[in-house]
Amino acid sequence: VEDIKAFNQGMNNTTTALDLLKIYEKLAVGNVINSEISKEMVDILKKQKYDDIIPKYLPKSIEVAHKDGWINGVRHDSGIVFLDDNTSYVLVLLSKNFEDEIKGADLLAKVSLEIYNSLL
């Protein structure tokens, strides 16, 4: 995250795919604080307005609770994909150094679709 005050003090906000995976796995089973709060968080994430990566090519019947992000050359999306059979999976897509961020986001969306199709 571009946090200028932190950066000027030699700090930088970072995450890893594993960090995000662990958070979303806990959310998916209701283990972030408690099941009620986890459900509230998932409901908020289902209202994400930017759907140009994980959900972009998925069938409209598939719900996704996710959070994307972008800063200079970086595109990310991570979340829980809820399948029609009441199962779900966690997907974390992190990238950097795309020359064309729009094409990069579309490539990540295609990766999301491939993963979805492989799990059917």
Spans of features found by a protein language model:
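Solvent-exposed, acidic/flexible segments
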Residues: G10-A17, N34-S38, I71, D100-L108
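Mid-domain, small-residue-enriched loop/turn segments at the edges of structured enzyme/sensor domains
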Residues: V1-Y24
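Conserved active-site loop region of the serine DD-peptidase/beta-lactamase
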Residues: A17-W70
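Surface-exposed amphipathic alpha-helical segments
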Residues: A105-L120
